[in-house]
Amino acid sequence: MTTPWRSVQISDDAAGLVDSNLILNLNEPNRLGDVSWFKPGKYAGVWWSLHLQTESWAAGDQHGATTANTRRYIDFAADNGLIGVLVEGWNRGWNGDWFGWGREFEFAGASEDFDLDTLSDYAKKKGVQLILHHETGCAVSRYERQLSDAMTLAEKHGVHAIKTGYVCDSGQIQRQDVEGGPISREWHDGQWMSNHFLRVLQEAAKHRIAINSHEPIKDTGLRRTWPNWISREGARGMEYNAWGNPKNPPSHEVNLVYTRLLSGPMDYTPGVVSLKGRGDTPIPSTLARQLALYVVIYSPIQMLADLPEHYAEHPEVMPFLRAVPTDWESSQLVAGEVGEYAVMARRDRNSSAWYVGAITDEHGRQIDLPLSFLDPKRKYRAEIYRDGDDADFRSNPFAFASETRTVTAADRLQLRIAPGGGEAIRFVPLR
């Protein structure tokens, strides 16, 4: 008899929980072999505007996934060293009531105003890849019947990552074992759906495609066995700060570190530097916090979620956003308490640079940060992006400061984090 693992993590402190690899190591080793065709990195895309309702998934005058608009995002990605551009609403089937229905989605057919051939060629010339979106809208069996054709189309156009979606009310997943036959309903986290996610991964792997699942099943470390399962959502992400009532409070992202993120990476989609949701409603965050989230919340694929024009309005954040990697050689929680704050240090896998991200809940705090994680034989240039002295997520969220210092592993930094704020630091070795 084969049974699933059930695990309990016990630690003397919060860092012991965060630094544990227990869940990952309970899974079988890599079954796919060489997956070097997937490159971790950052992406932009047609997404945030849809949640703001300034553009639409559906075709028409407000359609976001047009050839011209996608080209604009490709230019932005290329100019800022991003690897990809996500396009939601690129395919046919979004018109009408797709939520919980999804029976008109076509995953191998582009919308009339989205020229996939032209855009994939343009992206390739710019050194950028398209990231396609497969939203099922509950109609999961319909997706499975198109899966091979959909992956073949994506591979043909140089796509190496697909974001899948399962927007559907609880217990309403549509299962149809025979086309035209009766439809039964499945639970989102039931056995049939668990097997569905594996079927998608396996088909995607045949085409050298990685999967970033939204509205997923919970993470149990299967990315060790199927390393093309690069990330997933699985908790309230940034989209709730567009239209949620309530929005994600500052404590939410802190709590993710000690709960959801214990199981694996999360595509949280940070970097909304406008700090505004739908109807210009304020997002509970400071500007510096949006930078810190790239280090605190781990995912090998991270989105610069805001609109290109909003980044143009905040050039002060772009040096960090261009530099911060998503692939880490080592990571450690250097300070933190459950539900209060978290300070994460990570070393870049492709250089000797270190990064620190610190976030707090609704309360401001001062943190004494020892730099003992740095190489004791080297000096570093610390590029600090912090909350301004009078920053507060409620009253002065854009108060922001940056500075540079020379430091060693023997030094300590005094972090002053505003209520709802954060701090991001890049440590670059000096010769």
Task: List the model feature ranges, each with a label.
Residues 69-89, 346, 353-362, 415-426:
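C-terminal substrate/ligand-recognition segments
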Residues 37, 66, 70, 112, ...:
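Active-site-proximal structural scaffolding
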Residues 200, 207-383, 387-391:
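Active-site-proximal substrate-binding groove within the catalytic cores of carbohydrate-active enzymes
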Residues 1-126, 134:
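Conserved structural scaffold segments of CAZyme catalytic domains across common CAZy folds
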Residues 15-16, 51-54, 77, 92-99, ...:
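Flexible loop/turn segments at secondary-structure boundaries
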Residues 360-431:
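C-terminal beta-sandwich/jelly-roll accessory domains of carbohydrate-active enzymes
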Residues 89-275:
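Aromatic- and carboxylate-enriched substrate-binding clefts and catalytic-loop regions
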